[in-house]
Amino acid sequence: MINNEPFPSADSASILTTSTSNNSLMSYNHQPQLSINSVQSLLEPVTPPPLGQMNNKRNHQKAHSLDLSGFNQFISSTQSPLALMNNTSTSNSANSFSPNPNAASNSTGLSASMANPPAILPLINEFDLEMDGPRRKSSHDFTVVAPSNSGVNTSSLIMETPSSSVTPAASLRNFSNSNNAASKCGVDNSSFGLSSSTSSSMVEISALPLRDLDYIKLATDQFGCRFLQKKLETPSESNMVRDLMYEQIKPFFLDLILDPFGNYLVQKLCDYLTAEQKTLLIQTIYPNVFQISINQYGTRSLQKIIDTVDNEVQIDLIIKGFSQEFTSIEQVVTLINDLNGNHVIQKCIFKFSPSKFGFIIDAIVEQNNIITISTHKHGCCVLQKLLSVCTLQQIFKISVKIVQFLPGLINDQFGNYIIQFLLDIKELDFYLLAELFNRLSNELCQLSCLKFSSNVVEKFIKKLFRIITGFIVNNNGGASQRTAVASDDVINASMNILLTTIDIFTVNLNVLIRDNFGNYALQTLLDVKNYSPLLAYNKNSNAIGQNSSSTLNYGNFCNDFSLKIGNLIVLTKELLPSIKTTSYAKKIKLKVKAYAEATGIPFTDISPQVTAMSHNNLQTINNENKNPHNKNSHNHNHNHNHNHAHNNNNNNNQKSHTRHFSLPANAYHRRSNSSVTNNFSNQYAQDQKIHSPQQIMNFNQNAYPSMGAPSFNSQTNPPLVSHNSLQNFDNRQFANLMAHPNSAAPIHSFSSSNITNVNPNVSRGFKQPGFMMNETDKINANHFSPYSNANSQNFNESFVPRMQYQTEGANWDSSLSMKSQHIGQGPYNQVNMSRNASISNMPAMNTARTSDELQFTLP
């Protein structure tokens, strides 16, 4: 093998002797290789063997391009580096012109020089030798030399000084092209002196008169664009350059706006143009605002133009470009959702007055464009910015369209933010609260169990609390502390909706507390921080304050609210063991404890204790709820066994372990046994023949004045989930406890059979087993919901019985007289709401189930 390394050669004997001694020395000094993870390698770093010695390994082919073994000659050589280089060139020239027949001596010639170690290492600049002789240097000759092994064509990187026939702009463009070509080939321009060439070219262009410059070519060049921007920034030349540039680029202004480099010059020029010049330029481009806005370069220029407009004439020209004469409604919607165009629309929103927003609002309210815009990432942001600055009339116009398409927005990943944004606008409370509740009440439970709509439900509940508590704090403060609050109609609607929402959450507690998203809405309703002023206890002065308005009976509302929220807290506490394996069980428990601390009731007393009832009393209650087909005979036996077990618990200790089924709602085992669902549906069909539907809740007109809104009909729109069978409750002991919160709680005062606000003379006309989530695969056959998605659970009407009440022979208390009230208008069939007909027949919790019920729950 012929070695062409640039090192001096020696005679054969010297080569053999030196090579042998050097190899023995290297083998003796070589340290064994250690693993990089070994302890010794960390304590004593190991020097790897020379690359030349590694070539002796078997089955290893030497890579000539990586052969650095000859570099060791610099360490052992006594000659100067320049002498080595001279010898190398002599040796290489001899080898290149006369082949050496003795390859062995030539291959060992590298190690011969190691006998003469150099005194010093070579400096970097000592290698910068002119191989081809001295080079002529001239101020008009700029030649770039590329390395021979770089693979770059040297001729493509040569740039000479332009002759008199070439314009300066063309010279700059040629340099720019050569510079780009060099960068594409992986060549570093700085290593070849390109910066000097650029400086020289720019100096020559700067020396030319301003009238002789080609502004069009300079504006579309990377360096020429920077050159002109600097000229504009120079105070002495700014006005002259502006006028000359304006005259040349006026016919090509649209092209410059869309140019990758020209758009920067346009943005800079906007700061220096006069009002007349800017108006003329806007006149040339306003018919093309759509094309400019969607362009990645044009959007920057147009935003700068909008940001620097000086008068109404310029604004009107831009608005005219967005009118339907030049830009259609579909194109405006495209701009709102476009990556580049949405910034132009936002610039118009923040720069122009609301009277100029007509083209945006017209596009939003056209047909179903509100869905297209609100459910888009960029459109959602534009719509929120628009709602934050436009007038109340414009907000109302948009909000009506949003409410119209509410089902398509509330559970969308972007659309739900629009609804939440509307809830923050106080001026819309007079109609928005009632409209939202009218459209969402029948689906409130299911919406609470969906990922995005659950955020809207939480926001809605917090809104109700904020309106009512704000009224209370303002009403009980002094005259100097009172501020503007919502009107009486808004407060009335908020009170009615809040009480109804608590009832809906109570009957659907089994579903909400086990759902991965529904538990968040439940926690919001349970959080005592939201309603601490509403608790009707003597120690809470705000709850017993005098009302400033005679039309509002706040005392009655506080009593009703305290009873309902107390009932919900008790039932939630009762269900805590069933969710102990979930991640949010501790948070819900803390909410219950916070309620106990706020009301002064020990946490342990909140736990329900089912009272011992005699067999005769239980027989009487069951007979009231019994139908002619004896469908409740099983419930009678179950309740009898249940009370018998609790009678024994009074004397004996309860079993140390009770099995609870605590799987989240989304993880429940789905059964394929259709007989279970069919039997349950048949039983419900018998109920339908016997019991006529009654009002769920009716708001007392004396306590809450009518708002003139239609009522809801539960028969037409059944609730989403089963209204669990509840025991008959009596509120007398709980009301007595509220009157004396500091006294000792009587035994069984917090029984789940004593909390709910229901008149004991009223009997409920239905009995049914609890809702079983493991049958959700059978309840989705015939029911369609506009809020359904992959994460939702639809509930079949045949499986979910409607809430019905039987009021045969019932005499409602005169203080709680029922009169149908209304909560707002809506397209759905309404459900009559009653503020005092609270939830009954809740199934007993934590009790042993019969074999018939276990077939629903056991996996």
Curated annotation (Swiss-Prot):
Residues 86-108 have a biased composition (Low complexity). Coiled coil: none annotated. One of its GO terms (cellular component) is cytoplasm. It is found in: Cytoplasm. Its main location: cytoplasm. The keyword Transit peptide does not apply. Residues 188-596 form the PUM-HD domain. Residues 628-645 have a biased composition (Basic residues). RNA-binding protein involved in post-transcriptional regulation. Negatively regulates expression of HO by binding to the 3'-UTR of HO mRNA. Predominantly binds to mRNAs encoding chromatin modifiers and spindle pole body components. Recognizes and binds to 5'-TGTAA[CT]A[AT]TA-3' in the 3'-UTR of target mRNAs. Multicopy suppressor of POP2 mutation. Required for high temperature growth. Present with 1240 molecules/cell in log phase SD medium. This is Suppressor protein MPT5.
